[in-house]
């Protein structure tokens, strides 16, 4: 499947530039762009990436890994790749800070699927940084409070049947849009907190 480029409307007039691929050999190029072109040039308080994972239908492994910096996104479909991307593993372990929501399962899935762990202190769980009235504030609650009310229906507007299709290549447009918005929320929440 060739790499695809898409523009996704996140909320309001905010547009996201998305690269979607399952080609391991193309991932290093996009990782270099994320790091050298945008992350390295950012101010210190903006030197982090949004990270999110979508799981296989059996919930045992990683199907999709989403990386985000500002409005630049990489959606790598690990489940339909050749599962050999040492540059991605090096990138995840390189000391870059990643912001995500509810890291417990993601850490287990990365260990199971990739055989790696992101270094301690480099993976920020937004649920421990920001709380509303709940003991564990959901991503949707945080997104509505800090980004835009449109995120309140994001999960319910995404058909449950599509959650089982993260391994299907190529991904449907609705899955690409959901994955991009999901990673966008992780990035935007940490930026605002």
Regions found by a protein language model. Give the residues of each.
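N-terminal accessory regions of nucleic-acid-interacting proteins
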Residues: 1-49, 81, 126
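Short acidic, Gly/Ser-rich segments with clustered Asp/Glu that frequently serve as metal-coordination loops
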Residues: 48-60
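A short alpha/beta connector and helix-capping loop motif
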Residues: 58-73
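Nucleic-acid-processing active sites and adjacent nucleic-acid-binding tracks
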Residues: 72-92, 96
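Acidic beta-strand-to-loop metal/phosphate-binding motif
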Residues: 96-103
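A short alpha->loop->secondary-structure connector
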Residues: 113-123
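Short alpha-helix plus adjacent loop in nuclease-associated cores
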Residues: 124-148
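Acidic, Mg2+-coordinating catalytic module of metal-dependent nucleases/exonucleases
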Residues: 147-193
């Amino acid at each position: 499947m060739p790499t695809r480029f898409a523009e996704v409307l996140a909320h309001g007039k905010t547009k996201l530039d998305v690269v979607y691929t399952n080609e391991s050999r193309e991932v290093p190029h996009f990782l270099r762009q994320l790091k050298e072109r945008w992350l390295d040039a950012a101010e210190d308080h903006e030197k982090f990436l949004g990270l999110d994972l979508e799981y296989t239908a059996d919930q045992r492994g990683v199907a999709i890994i989403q990386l985000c910096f500002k409005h630049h996104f990489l959606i790598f479909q690990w489940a339909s790749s050749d599962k050999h991307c040492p540059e991605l593993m090096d990138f995840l372990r390189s000391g870059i800070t990643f912001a995500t929501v509810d890291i417990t399962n993601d850490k287990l899935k990365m260990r199971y699927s990739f055989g790696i762990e992101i270094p301690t202190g480099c993976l920020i769980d937004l649920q421990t940084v920001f709380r509303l009235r709940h003991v564990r504030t959901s991503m949707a609650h945080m997104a509505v409070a800090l980004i835009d009310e449109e995120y309140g229906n994001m999960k319910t507007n995404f058909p449950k049947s599509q959650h089982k299709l993260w391994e299907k290549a190529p991904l449907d447009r609705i899955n690409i849009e959901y994955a991009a918005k999901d990673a966008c929320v992780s990035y935007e929440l940490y930026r605002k907190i």
